[in-house]
């Protein structure tokens, strides 16, 4: 079954995995078995050495836990890039427009690893440019939502609405937990404070992140993202 999938289903020529990689029923398959399978079908296999961060082994489980805890600096260090997603911009309830902070809304698909609910400093890629974003991940308790989503204000973007476009967004740093405000005026004041914090974090990241984290990031992530109808952003 595994051989058929690798050879005919995926047409795999090269496979890379971690030293402790296990797969199959009851995790019976290991790197030695996979190596023999690749050799038997003319493929190549590369075992990636274990990587440590802060004295502990980096693993998918550890990265997911850090995402769920909102530890984005650690996530960036372990992934070698910021955690992000690329989803379509959908219509919301337009509260942001009402209070002068228009936002883009992006829904999370089923089984997506949800970050800790709250506000983040983010990077948003639009038409080859990188913008500072103030992103709320959660259910918007002040105005109410029946599902978790990403809602981002892009203070410096003045290019009109982005509905229907598929945009890349990266979460750089956690700012605060999600909370309910007594009214929209209080929410507006808080968003202004969050924007100042997010901008400081965004500028620090752009300046300090090593080149391998975001080489030509605006070109690599912000261009050639498709719309739903197949045209390019």
Region spans (language model):
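Classical nucleotidyltransferase
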Residues: 1-102, 125, 182-188, 192-195, ...
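Phosphate/ribose-recognition catalytic cores of enzymes acting on nucleotide-derived substrates
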Residues: 92-233
């Amino acid at each position: 079954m595994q051989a058929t999938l690798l050879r005919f289903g995926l047409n795999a020529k090269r496979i890379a995995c971690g030293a402790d990689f296990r797969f199959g029923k009851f995790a019976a398959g290991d790197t030695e078995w996979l190596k023999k399978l690749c050799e038997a079908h003319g493929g190549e296999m590369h075992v990636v050495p274990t990587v440590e961060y802060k004295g502990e082994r980096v693993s998918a489980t550890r990265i997911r836990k850090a995402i769920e805890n909102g530890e984005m600096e650690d996530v960036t260090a372990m992934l070698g890039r910021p955690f992000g997603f690329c989803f379509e911009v959908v219509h919301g309830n337009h509260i942001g427009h009402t209070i002068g902070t228009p936002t883009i809304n992006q829904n999370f698909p089923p089984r997506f690893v949800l970050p800790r609910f709250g506000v983040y400093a983010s990077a948003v890629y639009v038409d080859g440019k990188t913008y500072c974003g103030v992103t709320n991940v959660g259910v918007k308790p002040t105005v109410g939502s029946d599902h978790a989503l990403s809602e981002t204000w892009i203070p410096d973007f003045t290019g009109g609405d982005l509905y229907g476009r598929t945009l890349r967004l990266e979460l750089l740093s956690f700012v605060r937990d999600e909370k309910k405000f007594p009214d929209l005026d209080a929410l507006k004041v808080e968003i202004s404070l969050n924007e100042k914090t997010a901008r400081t974090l965004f500028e620090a990241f752009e300046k300090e992140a090593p080149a391998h984290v975001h080489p030509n990031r605006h070109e690599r992530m912000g261009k050639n993202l498709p719309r739903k109808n197949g045209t390019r952003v």
